[in-house]
Amino acid sequence: VGGRGALGPWWVLFRAGNSTVGVFGVFLGAMLALGGLPEGDFALISVLQALSVWSFMCSWNALNDYLDLEIDRVNRPDRPLPSGAISEASAKRGIALMMTLSVVSIAGAAATASGTVGGIEGWYPSLAIWLGALFLLTNYESAAPFSLRLKERGLPGNIAISLSVGMVVLFGAAGVFEPFNHRAWTVFVIGVLYTLAREIVKDVEDMEGDEGRSTYAMQVGPQRARTLAWALLLLTLASMLLPFAIGIFPELHLVGVIPALVVLMLAKPKLVLSEDHAAQQLIKKSMYLCLAALLGSSLLA
């Protein structure tokens, strides 16, 4: 399960390494909005919000594994829960602990914001975004009667995941009192499209183990799912280029996103050849290259 001693299974259950992407997302949003690193109270708010996102994502990842235990006995028997490395009772406590840490961190950010010039009112959009992410989480994972049960609805579930990923950037921008910053919203749109395409391809990749689940790929078949994923990637490409055309980012900085465009285009032949794992990995690499380029452009502008 991992080479990190007693913490190894927990590291895997929480996907703690992958969850650090949320930390990057918060600071990305803040730096896009400010054109540089946050300082003073803004720096403290950003750190607390980054911790809140990290622990929120850890909790979400563990909850997903907990609810998918039977599926993972087929798909991923080496995961901490199906392998027995972590008990179900311990996992529930870990999920609650991480969500508590997220709540405490967001409360700390609120307390810090209340002492700034903008006051708590200027910070409220951050709270709205956090609550929005919590709404998506509960309605994605929960099978309760009042839940939207997004996980069981195929594409709406993929959209919920994608929105929650993109919202991290807006969360970071809102933390520095810039919730409507154009650069942050541009990256939000790009991130949502990238993630949605990748989630669909990952569903195709997992079709064998997802038998009985109503994923989009299971509903329409692998070829139609791959076609939609590619259409979304073309929209992603357009959303990467448009901000340079309308002045949100300087035209001269367009060269910075060329590597991301090239890697994105490499995903097409992989989809045609049904090499779904390779395709979704290329999509992820392209997204990271794009985010790095847009951050660099924002800092240099």
Give residue spans per PLM region.
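Hydrophobic, membrane-facing alpha-helical anchors
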Residues: 2-3, 70-74, 132-145, 183-186, ...
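Intramembrane alpha-helical segments
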Residues: 3-12, 20, 83, 89-180
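Lipid-exposed faces of alpha-helical membrane segments in multi-pass integral membrane proteins
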Residues: 20, 24, 28, 51, ...
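Membrane-embedded alpha-helical segments that form the functional core of polytopic membrane enzymes
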Residues: 23-67, 102-107, 123-138, 180-201
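Functional transmembrane core segments of multi-pass inner-membrane proteins
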Residues: 33-48, 159-207, 223-240
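Transmembrane helix-loop junctions in multipass membrane proteins, especially transporters and channels
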Residues: 34-38, 69-70, 110-118, 142-146, ...
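Solvent-exposed interhelical
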Residues: 52-103, 192-240
